């Protein structure tokens, strides 16, 4: 997948979802909850199957240190959530909708943009195409919730769309920045890339588990068949990507191995032939 396509998918999925708040009833959240359940399960599975093994096998930083950075990312997201009020996992605060003019939620917007910026970092590390769709789907309810919150302020429609566009641009910006870091084009911080990735993994673990816990019924211990199907679908899609990539990887490795063995046999045959002539 080209960088242009990745940026387009990430930007327009969030932008269109945020703008949709002008046309869709905000009290109909059942579909959003199912989308959240799917994206939460997908993000969690991708993190466990791809991102965690990759950062531990980078061999640039000891595993114990990587674990500390993952915990740091988890705690960092806890702090961010205090300011964002959970909008990054689709919380729509309807209790404020009765007020015609709320104060502009600057802390929410900043923390949400920082969160979205960091989410773009794993996309530059290797083959992360499958993660693009997980993040894009995850941003649908987040952008919708942000749009709902901004509608309650004194801002006009054009300004609301502008702020939604700023949020939508954050993850593509994180992806481009991460790509520059991993290529060594931005400063001399490529050596810290695995630590940055570990922080993002901690954020993903917090976000995905929070989504899975909160996206069901009011009673979290009640079995919800639709939510369970959405969760299983998210895991199955990530597993399909994992198995497909694993097959390609093993097939790719098999080729050079056979080539090496063939070259070795050929050299051995030439050596015997030379001895026979001698």
List each language-model region with its residue ranges:
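Intrinsically disordered, metal-sensing/regulatory segments
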Residues: 1-278
């Amino acid at each position: 997948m080209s960088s242009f396509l990745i940026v387009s998918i990430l930007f327009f999925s969030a932008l269109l979802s945020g703008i949709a708040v002008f046309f869709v009833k905000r009290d109909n959240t059942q579909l959003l909850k199912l989308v959240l359940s799917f994206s939460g399960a997908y993000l969690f599975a991708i993190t466990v199957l791809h991102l965690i093994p990759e950062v531990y096998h980078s061999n640039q930083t000891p595993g114990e240190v990587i674990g500390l950075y993952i915990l740091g990312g988890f705690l960092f997201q806890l702090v961010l959530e205090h300011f964002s009020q959970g909008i990054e996992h689709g919380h729509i605060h309807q209790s404020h909708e009765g007020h015609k003019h709320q104060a502009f939620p600057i802390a929410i917007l900043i923390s949400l943009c920082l969160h979205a910026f960091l989410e773009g970092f794993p996309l530059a590390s290797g083959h992360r195409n499958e993660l693009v769709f997980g993040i894009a789907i995850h941003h649908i309810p987040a952008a919708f919730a942000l749009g709902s919150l901004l509608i309650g302020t004194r801002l006009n429609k054009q300004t609301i769309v502008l702020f939604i566009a700023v949020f939508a641009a954050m993850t593509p910006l994180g992806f481009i920045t991460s790509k520059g870091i991993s290529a060594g084009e931005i400063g001399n911080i490529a050596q810290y890339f695995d630590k940055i990735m570990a922080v993002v993994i901690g954020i993903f673990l917090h976000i995905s588990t929070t989504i899975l816990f909160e996206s069901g019924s009011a009673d979290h211990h009640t079995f919800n068949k639709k939510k369970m199907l959405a969760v299983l679908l998210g895991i199955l899609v990530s597993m399909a990507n994992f198995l497909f990539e694993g097959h390609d990887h093993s097939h790719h490795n098999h080729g050079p191995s056979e080539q090496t063995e063939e070259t070795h046999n050929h050299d051995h045959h030439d050596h015997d032939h030379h001895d026979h002539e001698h």
